[in-house]
Amino acid sequence: MGKIIGIDLGTTNSCVAVMQGSQPTVIENSEGNRTTPSVVGFTKTGDRLVGQAAKRQAITNPKNTIFSIKRFMGRRFDEVGEEKKMAPYELINDSGEARVKINDKVYSPQEISAMVLQKMKQTAEDFLGEKVTEAVITVPAYFNDAQRQATKDAGRIAGLEVKRIINEPTAAALAYGLDKKNASEKVAVFDLGGGTFDISILELGEGVFEVKSTDGDTHLGGDDFDQKIIDYIAEEFKKQEGIDLRKDAITLQRLKEAAEKAKIELSSRSDTEINLPFITATQEGPKHLVINLTRAKFEAISADLFNKVLDPCRRAVKNAKIEMREIDEVVLVGGSTRIPKIQALVKEFFGKEPNKSVNPDEVVAIGAAIQGGVLKGDVTDVLLLDVTPLSLGIETLGGVMTKLIEANTTIPTKKQEVFSTASDNQTSVEVHVLQGERPMAADNKTLGRFHLGDIPPAPRGIPQVEVIFDIDANGILHVSAKDKATGKEQSIRIEASSKLSDAEINKMKDDAKQHADEDKKRKEEIDIKNSADALIFSTEKQLTELGEKIPTDKKSALEGSLDKLRDAYKNGTTESIKSAMDDLNSQWNSIASDLYQSGAGAAQAQPEAPQNSGSSQSSGGDGAVNAEYEVINDDKK
């Protein structure tokens, strides 16, 4: 059997490594470099270039040169508005999917990524002198289910069996801690790359690498800092000459390369000159762009980006349930951590000098290679325990999201819960699978939907539908639903057809905090309506069963209170619903007392209305939750 290689498939650059004996080795590519630009170019003659060769010709061939494709992996066209503006190449809407159009041919992001992976695969094969068919590929910790699946698909297109998808900060921790297996440390991995930011808190000890929490922003990286410089120099030139350089693809590509170069230079210098001769021309002649950019100015125009790294850090430390002083090391990963302001922010936030002992460009690939060695059996006494970054659940009564798996749960994991129907004689249920942190289903991301049919007709709350969530070691979700009475089962593997945008996934947690009061109020309104609905249902049922035993005057008053609650339920406020419920319950208390004294069905007289029937209260026994499912009328088919 051949080697399992480790690949860091980055937004800006990619890297490949392999275990050689007990040590990981980063492999140089055919140009003699240890990292390869994640760039693919298509020439006018039809040749395909990957890596440095593609990057070199980008200025003269911007519309046919693809970079930062990782930002489009596993995403729909309507989710990539901002990224689309930054790309000089053509992005099209292909049946809702974001695709790249080159010379009248359409490519999926997975296909473009596969071309980069093929370059990594060939690099490893040249080094090892043997065919490579298996790999461990890294992804940002905050990549969602669709993006992870898209990464696996890219590997498959490249001719690789992806043995494991591993989170980038976790891979970095593996590389950092491989020679410290007997030590016990709490480590924060601060990973700021070309397109994404992750922060993970891990506990290392006796060969166990346990992720305690992870957070991040999948729309924050070196590309965004480059864009700040592009916008700054373009606006300065526009002030001087009245021309917006960003409207021409070739000029925009020149600006991008100049911005990236300036950013890198400002990591070691206090200022840099951006000099682009013959950047454009007017009737007066050629125009040249010459702008001096200081580090202070760069930090000022990028202030909002620098500030964005702090909130994920705060959440990660809080969710890890540790004190800041307990963190022993802060390991910097990703090329963007070379920015002095980032290093200063990390030092200020964590109260200690960041650890720069690992190569930020190579450490993730090294960690992936180590994981490959673990899977192969070449590396022993290492156990990796990772987590899922966002909560997973289903929609239940009233549009509430009921979580089955909480964020930062160790994976692989399997959770199940029993739900029930929301209507009498309901013969089919729809399971609406969600990912996110907001209380309401509509505010979270739909991962998929599927139906379970042929449920025997029964009063609502009686059928028992067991929903099972199963996350594998790659962080990919499998969901199934089973009717416990008939044993009939339906399942779904959440595929890459349902995707989150890079901005959305981080926005979920931010919104959960910013709109906490609004969410709480909306959830209370739903809970009250659910309770009112249950009280109406049980009152109607018991009126039918006990009608003749209830005194006429009290029955009339009860029916009046019931009508009042029905009206409040349809048209009233939360307060009016509460008032009507109190009135109806008061009527029942009086009737229950009379029935008890007469011995006529006192045990049945008081209907029990669940207080939170939309999320966790029982209706029908066996801990079943009233779930809002779509009723399918089979007669209309």
Curated annotation (Swiss-Prot):
Origin species: Chlorobium chlorochromatii (strain CaD3)
Protein name, UniProt field: Chaperone protein DnaK
Phosphothreonine: modified positions: T196
InterPro entries: ATPase_NBD (IPR043129), Chaperone_DnaK (IPR012725), Heat_shock_70_CS (IPR018181), HSP70_C_sf (IPR029048), HSP70_peptide-bd_sf (IPR029047), Hsp_70_fam (IPR013126)
Taxonomic superkingdom: Bacteria
Biased composition, class Low complexity, residue ranges: 598-619
Gene3D superfamilies reported in the protein's UniProt record: 1.20.1270.10, 3.30.420.40, Actin, Chain A, domain 4, Substrate Binding Domain Of DNAk, Chain A, domain 1
An example molecular function term from Gene Ontology annotations: unfolded protein binding
Transmembrane stretches, start-end: none
Induction statement: By stress conditions e.g. heat shock.
Function: Acts as a chaperone.
SUPFAM superfamilies listed in its UniProt record: Actin-like ATPase domain (SSF53067), Heat shock protein 70kD (HSP70), C-terminal subdomain (SSF100934), Heat shock protein 70kD (HSP70), peptide-binding domain (SSF100920)
Keyword terms, alphabetized: ATP-binding, Chaperone, Nucleotide-binding, Phosphoprotein, Stress response
HAMAP family: DnaK
Location of region: Disordered: 503-525, 598-637
Family listed: Belongs to the heat shock protein 70 family.
Entry keyword annotation includes Acetylation: no
Keyword Ribonucleoprotein: no
